[in-house]
């Protein structure tokens, strides 16, 4: 898949698997939007690593559990770059439940 100059949004893109995806997409020539919710320093570090390697990236904050944050993030990317070509839905929404209440695991979030 040719990703050269494509706009790639990686949710949770500053740490773990998201960071690896961000780095690989940038290595292949994508312009990477590194999303973070609370991990700003890690996202900025990932952007810096990409830029030092000759790639293009920027950090963008949004809590993916909040629809308004997601809409604002997409609008900001579209306003700046015209589109989002690639989406890596890496970030997750977690909810802690008691181990003795497995019924709670089947409820909708």
Swiss-Prot record:
TM annotation in the entry: none
Disulfide feature: none
SUPFAM superfamilies: NAD(P)-binding Rossmann-fold domains
Signal peptide: none
InterPro entries named among the record's database cross-references: NAD(P)-bd_dom_sf, SDR, SDR_fam
Matches recorded under Pfam families: adh_short (PF00106)
Family, per entry: Belongs to the short-chain dehydrogenases/reductases (SDR) family.
Protein name: Short-chain dehydrogenase/reductase homolog YusS
Organism of this sequence: Bacillus subtilis (strain 168)
Lineage: Bacteria, Bacillati, Bacillota, Bacilli, Bacillales
């Amino acid at each position: 898949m040719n990703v050269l100059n494509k706009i790639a949004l990686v949710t949770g893109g500053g740490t773990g698997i998201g960071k690896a995806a961000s780095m690989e997409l940038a290595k292949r020539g994508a312009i990477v939007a590194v999303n973070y919710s609370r991990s700003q320093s890690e996202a900025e570090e990932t952007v810096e690593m990409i830029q030092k390697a000759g790639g293009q990236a920027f950090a963008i904050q949004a809590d993916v559990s909040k629809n308004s944050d997601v809409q604002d993030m997409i609008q900001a990317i579209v306003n700046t770059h015209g589109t989002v070509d690639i989406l890596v839905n890496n970030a997750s929404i977690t909810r802690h439940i008691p181990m003795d209440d497995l019924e709670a695991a089947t409820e909708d979030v």
